[in-house]
């Protein structure tokens, strides 16, 4: 089972839990904090590594050695297999990292198109990712791989577990606090916001992960066609703020007028906004800001659909 963010909440955290989260959240949002994130790592190496990845990934792979870039691995139909980071570690070697637990899926997809290619693909064991987040992240970890997101700046320190240590003086924060900040910023994760039903433009990840000047790659046709039509897609990833304190479950239906128009993918309690917040895919007919109702078996609550990020 792939690693995903903390289990969905079933109730608003109590006072003690909120107090424990407050300092961690403040560090990640307003200062600098570090979280140990579950990530998987693959090594792609060999004389054909560059040309092979150039034909498989949405991003330009000719980056300088020692640098990285965000990219997508897509199905031929243009649906998402993985959002990953391409790290060039040598002239003929790359390390790919992505949300933990998805290595088998990524390896299977890469191997499916690896025909007469002089390059090996192997899972790298024993590596870790320390996510340094907050306005002070780049200063605290100047050698990290960029992991900035609108309203949520940061860098990641990746490498063998014994060699990657938290920056001195940076607060170690809980995954739960990171999850709140992630949802507020609209950072999608695999298994929740990203799966094989998602078109990249729906998730708002095209700008950070796609090159429109490189050559052909698997899945390019749909990405290019949508871009040529102004990026119009049937639904988009949106932020949702509950009007009250009732915590809806993941999977709750977004209802507007007399229609079901979306579904929640991630939910957390935001102390900063004083309400539950969520990510969810919402039909394009519902333009933010918009009043909606969230419905699930045994409950419902009013909410507001907003553009991301929810907190900046």
Named regions from a protein language model:
Residues 158-237, 241:
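Anionic-ligand-binding alpha/beta catalytic cores of soluble enzymes and soluble regulatory domains
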Residues 1-81, 90:
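Acidic, proline/glycine-enriched N-terminal capping motif
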Residues 21-30, 73-83, 114-117, 138-145, ...:
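Short amphipathic beta-strand starts and helix->beta connectors
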Residues 46, 96, 134, 157, ...:
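Residue-level signal for inorganic ion chemistry
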Residues 2-5, 84, 198, 206-210, ...:
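Glycine-rich, small/acidic residue-mixed loop/short-helix segments
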Residues 48-53, 103-107, 137-140, 161-168, ...:
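Short, conserved charged micro-motifs
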Residues 33-34, 40-41, 82-189:
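Acidic, low-complexity central loop/insert segments
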Residues 54-62, 108-116, 228, 256-259:
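Short, intrinsically disordered, mixed-charge
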């Amino acid at each position: 089972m792939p690693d995903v963010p903390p289990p969905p909440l079933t109730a608003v955290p109590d006072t003690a839990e909120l107090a424990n989260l407050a300092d961690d959240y403040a560090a990640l949002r307003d200062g600098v904090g570090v979280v140990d994130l579950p990530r998987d790592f693959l090594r792609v190496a060999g004389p054909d590594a560059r040309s092979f990845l150039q034909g498989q990934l949405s991003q330009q792979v000719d980056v300088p050695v020692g640098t990285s870039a965000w990219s997508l691995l897509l199905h031929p139909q243009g649906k998402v297999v993985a959002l990953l980071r391409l790290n060039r570690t040598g002239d003929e070697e790359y390390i790919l990292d992505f949300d933990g637990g998805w290595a088998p899926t990524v390896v299977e997809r890469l191997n499916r198109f690896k025909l007469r290619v002089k390059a090996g693909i192997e899972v790298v064991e024993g590596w870790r990712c320390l996510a340094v987040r907050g306005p002070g992240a780049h200063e605290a970890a100047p050698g990290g791989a960029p992991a900035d997101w609108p309203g949520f700046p940061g860098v990641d320190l990746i490498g063998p577990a014994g060699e990657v240590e938290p920056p001195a003086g940076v607060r170690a924060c809980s995954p739960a606090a990171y999850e709140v900040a992630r949802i507020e910023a609209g950072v999608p994760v695999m298994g929740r916001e990203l799966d094989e039903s998602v078109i990249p433009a729906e998730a708002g990840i095209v700008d950070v992960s796609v090159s429109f000047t490189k050559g052909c790659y698997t899945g390019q046709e749909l990405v290019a066609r949508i871009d040529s039509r102004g990026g119009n897609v049937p639904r988009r990833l949106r932020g949702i703020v509950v009007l009250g304190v009732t915590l809806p479950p993941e999977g709750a239906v977004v209802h507007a007028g007399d229609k079901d128009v979306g579904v929640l993918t991630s939910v957390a309690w935001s102390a900063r906004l004083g309400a539950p917040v969520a990510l969810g895919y919402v039909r394009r007919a519902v333009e933010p800001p918009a009043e909606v109702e969230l419905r699930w078996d045994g409950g419902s609550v009013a909410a507001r659909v907003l553009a991301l990020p929810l907190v900046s």
